[in-house]
Amino acid sequence: MLRCIAVDDELLGLDLLEDYIRQVPYLELAAKCKNALEAIDVLRNHPIDLLFLDIQMPGLTGLQFIQSLTRKPMIIIDYGL
């Protein structure tokens, strides 16, 4: 089972990702985050294998977030909704 988080500043994007992740039997949604700072908090407390990430977010962008990671999970970037 791969533990993953979804990071998107738009609620629709988070909801679509949640629906997709729940359909894949080997994925477990550990958290939905509205921004990169929330995702950083989740990563501090939980081991995450897979990250679904929006690139264009206010504040810390998706690319800046990736650069800040010390342990790199598998990353899936911007799904272009």
Cite the ranges covered by each PLM segment.
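Active-site beta3 strand of CheY-like receiver
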Residues: 4, 46-52
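A short, hydrophobic beta-strand element within the central beta-sheet of small alpha/beta folds
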Residues: 67, 72-81
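Helix N-cap/capping motif at the beta->alpha junctions
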Residues: 32-41, 62
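Active-site residues of response regulator receiver
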Residues: 8, 54
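Hydrophobic/aromatic residues located in beta-strands of well-ordered beta-sheets
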Residues: 4, 29-30, 74-75
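Two-component/phosphorelay signaling modules centered on CheY-like receiver
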Residues: 11-31
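Receiver (REC) domain active-site loop signature in two-component systems and cognate sites
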Residues: 57
